[in-house]
Amino acid sequence: SVRISDTITNRGDDPQEFQILYHANYGPPLLEEGAQFVGPVKKVIPFNDHASESIDSYSIYKRPTAGFTEQVYCMTPLADYDGRTTIGLVNRSKNKGISMKFSIQQLPFITLWKNTNSEGEGYVTGLEPGTNFPNNRRIERKFGRVPKLDSGQSHHAEIDFTILKGNKAVGGLIDQIQKIQRRAQPVIETKPENKD
C-alpha cells in the first residue's frame, strides 16, 4: 500500500476558491476488455451526451478500440460509517486489481475517465477523486462544488492505494464495496447536468 497525503493552504489575505482532482491513471495489463470500475455510488451522471450513450455500461471497459472518443462519468460516492469510501479497478478474471480509499469529507466526488482507444493512442482509464467534477469554476459554482479556503486555512486529503493480487484479495474489495452500497440504491442519470 501507498498513501498520498496532500495539504493545500491559502497563504493569501483573502478567501480563495480552489478545486483539486487526483488523476490516477491505469492501463494494461490491469485494464483490459471486461475490466470493471468498482465503487459504492450514490449517483452517476454522464459528463456529456457522448457519455450518455454508454451509461448502462459505464463501469465496464471495452478492448482497445481505434478512434474511441473518451467518456467521462461524474459520481457521488457512498461511504462507510467512518466517512471513508473505497473504489477500484479490477481485471476481467477478478484476480488483479487496485483499490483507492479516501474520506468523502476531503474528496466528495469521483470522476471516471475512460479512454479505451488503441494502445498506441493511450488505452487508459483515470479514477479521479476530487473536490469537484472536471468543469470550469463557473459551472461548478452553479452546483455548489467549489470550496473556499479562508486566509491561512488548509485543506488536507489522503488517498490509500493498494495493489490486489489473487481472487481472494479482489473478492475482499468487492465484498467491502457491496457492503457500503447496501446503504443506498444508486441513482444512474441518463442525461448530463444542465451546464447553461
Predicted regions and their residues:
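Short beta-strand elements of extracellular/lumenal beta-sandwich folds
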Residues: 2-9, 90, 113, 119
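Active-site/ligand-binding surface loops and adjacent short beta/alpha elements
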Residues: 27-28, 32-104
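Active-site pocket scaffolds in enzymes
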Residues: 96-196
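Hydrophobic residues positioned within well-ordered beta-strands of beta-sheet architectures
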Residues: 4, 20-22, 85-87, 125, ...
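Short solvent-exposed strand-capping/beta-turn motif centered on an Asx-Ser/Thr pair
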Residues: 9-14, 92, 164-166
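Acidic, contiguous internal or C-terminal segments within carbohydrate-active enzymes
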Residues: 1-24
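Solvent-exposed loop and beta-edge segments used for protein-protein assembly and interaction
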Residues: 1, 16, 79-83, 151-155
